[in-house]
């Protein structure tokens, strides 16, 4: 039954998600093209520096390409955010609105229903995350004229606290991407839990309550991890490196716990507490 529910969820998600993914890819490719064009115009401006008019025009064109590249980068980021909003609102609509009455009459356990929605949502979020990582890598290659080491550095920054102890190599890049995928699971799980708690507690403005819960819970978790991370940086170099590694593992465990616990608690609340009447 889990497989059937998962397939049904994917059929409902894939068309809107494909449009958002296409926007992300097109924006990323155009942005990379603008970066390459900026470099070409800058070189041309160097040759034309003896001619005031040509140099001024080249300078203006460089600004245009830079702004276009920044706008394309914003579109990539906005597409990534949009897919999470789409996932969350579909979960809310199919569980806690009038459509939820029909959903909850299905002859399946609430845990199976929520799990199917989570895995479909996580698959989409993971796909968008990987595409965003690939576009960021290509953009960095364009900016640095093919310097692969800088790509490794950028990807390793996705590793959270582990980025402070990594050497920017392949292993750090893999850890960074893996942490980004774990963060995607955390985001989906926490969103589902926040929406469920909002539907349970709030009589009105349930979505607003869910947003407040999501921000509040996420802020508390980030604050606690930040405090632990700062405390871990007290000591000699060897101790700090080890402790930051511990904090990195702790961060991953917490994110996975929030993802799994959010799904489990959401399923329990849907079954036992949420009243759609």
Language-model regions, residue ranges each:
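Hydrophobic alpha-helical transmembrane segments of membrane proteins
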Residues: 1-100, 110-277
